[in-house]
Amino acid sequence: MKILIILTILAMATTFATSEMQVNPSVQVQPTQQQPYPESQQPFISQSQQQFPQPQQPFPQQPQQPFPQSQQQCLQQPQHQFPQPTQQFPQRPLLPFTHPFLTFPDQLLPQPPHQSFPQPPQSYPQPPLQPFPQPPQQKYPEQPQQPFPWQQPTIQLYLQQQLNPCKEFLLQQCRPVSLLSYIWSKIVQQSSCRVMQQQCCLQLAQIPEQYKCTAIDSIVHAIFMQQGQRQGVQIVQQQPQPQQVGQCVLVQGQGVVQPQQLAQMEAIRTLVLQSVPSMCNFNVPPNCSTIKAPFVGVVTGVGGQ
């Protein structure tokens, strides 16, 4: 770009000088002392002399004057360096990012003072607490507490019902009792016998200590009554008070037992005392070994039915 501008200027100057010489041929130009060109212009003048051929007619050489200052400035103007695009522009100082939800302590907006509005004390009339109406409690007539079955006069009957598995175990085929020959017979059906044995032992374990003898007597009486019905023995049920019936005397009993049947009852008692304690781990007091039958009347006298 610079070379083009310089060549254009030189071409214009040469054309101007040639036209002036053709218009005034009488004017002789005296040679003047050549002044050295500036170093910056010498290569351009030599370049122009090489490109443009000199006219064959010698022309008087005009003194070459240096270009005016304005032209020199024009020639030197392209020599200025243009700003490079890589020049760094002044950077603005990075401001710290302010969070929109953060408040600056220096610029706190003045807040109006918190005004507490006076609340008028409203006391609503509260109705008096009335107790919840409860229905009148009806007192049911208290029934007299019945004594425990062990304390009832019907203890023998109760024990006979509870200890029925013991009677069935000793009387039936599990361990049949022959009241006539006092011997044991064979044992069959062990599975059902084991069930009756467990039930018998469970009932005996619930009997208090003071009623163990009564329990043994109940088992003996139940077996005796069962065998008496099978053998056709007549046992008359009576009231437990002593009474005079002909020549027979009832002693604290519920039935009448002939004297010849007393030995049979003793054999049953002996069998029960030998079987039940060892079978159920049932401790029998020593005084239970004697014959006590408060529920059976013993017949005394002769000829009583």
UniProtKB/Swiss-Prot annotation:
**Which interval of the chain is the signal sequence?**
1-19
Low complexity composition bias: residue spans: 27-54, 67-90
The entry's localization annotation reads:
Cytoplasm; Vacuole
Domain comment in the entry: Sulfur-rich hordein which possesses an N-terminal half composed of proline-glutamine blocks organized in repeating units and a C-terminal half where the repeats are dispersed and less conserved.
Task: Report the sequence similarity comment from the record.
Answer: Belongs to the gliadin/glutenin family.
What name does this protein carry? Gamma-hordein-1
- What is the top-level taxon of the source organism? Eukaryota
| GO terms, molecular function | nutrient reservoir activity
Composition bias, Pro residues? 55-66, 110-138
Q: Where is this region: Disordered?
A: 27-90, 105-146
Q: Which CDD domains match?
A: AAI_SS
What is known about the tissue distribution of this protein? Developing endosperm.
Q: Can you list the GO cellular component terms from the UniProt entry?
A: vacuole
The alphabetized UniProt keywords are: Cytoplasm, Seed storage protein, Signal, Storage protein, Vacuole
